[in-house]
Amino acid sequence: MENMENDENIVVGPKPFYPIEEGSAGTQLRKYMERYAKLGAIAFTNAVTGVDYSYAEYLEKSCCLGKALQNYGLVVDGRIALCSENCEEFFIPVIAGLFIGVGVAPTNEIYTLRELVHSLGISKPTIVFSSKKGLDKVITVQKTVTTIKTIVILDSKVDYRGYQCLDTFIKRNTPPGFQASSFKTVEVDRKEQVALIMNSSGSTGLPKGVQLTHENTVTRFSHARDPIYGNQVSPGTAVLTVVPFHHGFGMFTTLGYLICGFRVVMLTKFDEETFLKTLQDYKCTSVILVPTLFAILNKSELLNKYDLSNLVEIASGGAPLSKEVGEAVARRFNLPGVRQGYGLTETTSAIIITPEGDDKPGASGKVVPLFKAKVIDLDTKKSLGPNRRGEVCVKGPMLMKGYVNNPEATKELIDEEGWLHTGDIGYYDEEKHFFIVDRLKSLIKYKGYQVPPAELESVLLQHPSIFDAGVAGVPDPVAGELPGAVVVLESGKNMTEKEVMDYVASQVSNAKRLRGGVRFVDEVPKGLTGKIDGRAIREILKKPVAKM
């Protein structure tokens, strides 16, 4: 019988630099945070307000909240949720949940009411930790999601509008004089115990609840401490993040930073001048961004005003970054390249990462320790050799436990042999660098040709008059779909639809021309992490052009 899996075509990641440690995610996190607390290290800094949280303060508050949650009545398998924008208190409930074996479901106050009802309806939390901004929505959601018994205000030092703040909740649910040092973390079955319930990207409808275990989380901790695939561990190192904490990318990079003792400098929103000033003032060595912000930095006229000599790394994730934009930004910051990572919410974190000192323009990186990857033919499903495009599949100990109450969708994603089918088109080269080309679902089918939107977006972004662009297929009764684009022009620049179409036609093969037309817009529709919203672009392109 023919072996369907040619082992030569399976790319295997290296052995881990450090072995996976014993204990739950909470046990490991506490051990490292105690170490950094003794060193007097700072855990979080809000660059806008200047507020600092030391590791000692953060650990104490997380232990006290863990005890308060237990006394409130939450036991292993209980559920809590967050509904908040990024704030310095965001990770206190997350860490407390990890300490006591309670599943944590992060959401953002930017969610619409419909999205929030859907998300919290999946995770069914008993307590929601809400920011002041998110409170009205959570109060409304509570009427529908009746498991929610208590709302606690996350980002206030005093009670707010009749709802208890974090300190009040802790005080009410811990004995007088309670010492955080007496609190004991709960050991759990790592493989089975759900640590976090994340929202899938929702690119194919409303998000699903992704169950990530303590095993998934501690594997990520091992990668975070890996000097080749993660960080050089030096406590006190300042890193700047503007990535949403409720998203897998922001959640697991930040938990990884805490394992390494870094000072997480956060901006609650992106402003070019504040961003550059923060990099300079806090001597940040690394910054983590979503691709949307690269276009702004690429065209920035403020860069030369600031001393960014401490910056040694720009990391990108959450959505694909075009090779050209990545290279241009790296040049402007005098860096050898941009550090990329590729992963899905369902793989916990990045499972393909640029190894330290092994940049390759356009590549997403190499397979991380403890993981395997392969590229399969879209028709035969056989694994392919180097430089042949197909669907990327991955296997390893950070694959989710499954979707909440959705075994059918779980089976569609992860096959019987344990391979997760990513739905992304890609290939790897002879040196085992992986290149992600586009989403399988977003490929435009024009007369039997498969046209990747990302390739056309990359071509458009190279034009000096174009600031940003997004591409999608427009339904057509004869051709199937026609490639079309929405374009944001640089300030003060003008182009006609024909000029854009002619420019693209001069750069690509016949099937890839913009036959679906061009629309000029103020901004390209994108999700929170900078992922282009193909469905919204398709709707814009389907509308007839308004006649002047």
From Swiss-Prot:
Keyword Oxidoreductase: yes
Record motif Microbody targeting signal, residues: 546-548
InterPro entries: AMP-bd_C, AMP-bd_C_sf, AMP-binding_CS, AMP-dep_synth/lig_dom
Coiled coil: none
Enzyme class: oxidoreductase
PROSITE patterns: AMP_BINDING
Protein name: Luciferin 4-monooxygenase
Organism: Nipponoluciola cruciata (Genji firefly)
